[in-house]
């Protein structure tokens, strides 16, 4: 936190500030220790460096030239000789011999390197963990195909959007690879190493990602949840809400959840649970005409089982896997928090950390947990009555299984109610400035 000229950092006990005159300057950085080929990264204005990622500073044109050179096979080959242990200190990097090209070649190098930076940035910004994320690629690329007679009410297929996105990713992948190989050729020629080094780059060494159907569908689901909570909006690009005053007028096409609590149930008990909201989002985003086909595409991607409907597959994903995937994406610092009663899935609900307030847990308990409990009690009463009637062996066995499941859920939810009541009564508040890890 460098607010107020780094006041908190400078006054933190044991804090050591080094080279602060270089803070926020344009630079190239690299990791001191690498298990693979060293990689040099471009950092535009506005970043602070640390000792784990050492930096090079200078004029923009020089930095761009050095970025192209240092990421070439010429320098990676030299560094294997200079530092066979793959420990890259300033000494090894500063000992790299730099041969400057003529002006015409410098211009070519600059164009190739800056285009590569642009491609890498576009790739990174397509993921919601980027500060510059605008919208999900499958939303952006849906415009490639449309269905319907009314241009104002077209429907779109997620499958088509994915194929369009995939073509775009493949094109950028090939362009980046070609550019890197051309840079290798240029620097190999400058250093006179044509007989020692070949310019070819393996696909595994290209750092942008190709399209992946499962990853893109899961990230679309994550983006959808973000829209449910108001983190994102279909009306505006980028991050819409991460604290401060919540403005409901910024969510016209798809309304953000009003109370910041979205229940996750293993069956369709309510019309406002996460699966129903998800279906609404897909319909609003891609159209009514293609809704079922789009749900099928999503379910098949997630691994639809035998007799499952597409909705059941999507529900299973939300119940069992969504939160785990979310924690992986955000490196165990989730911004969506899960209220979870336990292994029986008696009660689950998501809340958005940035909209949390001290009344949220009491509301979740009274308006949602107790509603789920009442639903289970009614269902159990129906099953108990059914078991008093004349049933076939198969139907009786199914009813007994249902009875046991509901009893287990009720027991779990009652125990959870006691625990969450203790938290609710404390009316705990959080400070967003403390960060996700502390608050979670």
Segments predicted by a language model, with ranges:
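Amphipathic alpha-helical coiled-coil/heptad-repeat segments
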Residues: 72, 104-144
